Amino acid sequence: MPAPRFKSGSFKKISKRGPGNKTLTHHRRSKVSKAKCGACGALLNGVPRGRKIEIAKLSKTEKRPERPYGGFLCPKCLKRLMIEKARNL
């Protein structure tokens, strides 16, 4: 039986060969998916890929780009949004 903490779906099961040619099951946390743009779904640059506890240890400037909607919209969608807002004034 696996330990209760390993029953979560956030752990990947990896088979390893141990002493005496035994098959062992190691558990490793699965990777977090890459950040995507909220409008078009493109991958975002400058946004770290990691679990919340790992990202919490980073400084503010390492967590996301320092521009409006940084970490939520890609530069192309941001440009479109700014133009749209300027035209609606």
From Swiss-Prot:
Cellular component GO terms held in the UniProt record: ribonucleoprotein complex; ribosome
Organism lineage: Archaea, Methanobacteriati, Methanobacteriota, Methanomada group, Methanococci
UniProt-listed InterPro entries: Ribosomal_eL34, Ribosomal_eL34_C_sf, Ribosomal_L34e_arc-type
Name of the featured protein: Large ribosomal subunit protein eL34
Alphabetical UniProt keywords: Ribonucleoprotein, Ribosomal protein
One MF annotation (Gene Ontology) recorded for this entry: structural constituent of ribosome
Keyword Ribosomal protein: yes
Family that this chain belongs to: Belongs to the eukaryotic ribosomal protein eL34 family.
UniProt-listed NCBIfam families: PRK04059.1 (NF003143)
Region (Disordered): 1-32
UniProt-listed Pfam families: Ribosomal_L34e (PF01199)
GO BP annotations listed: translation
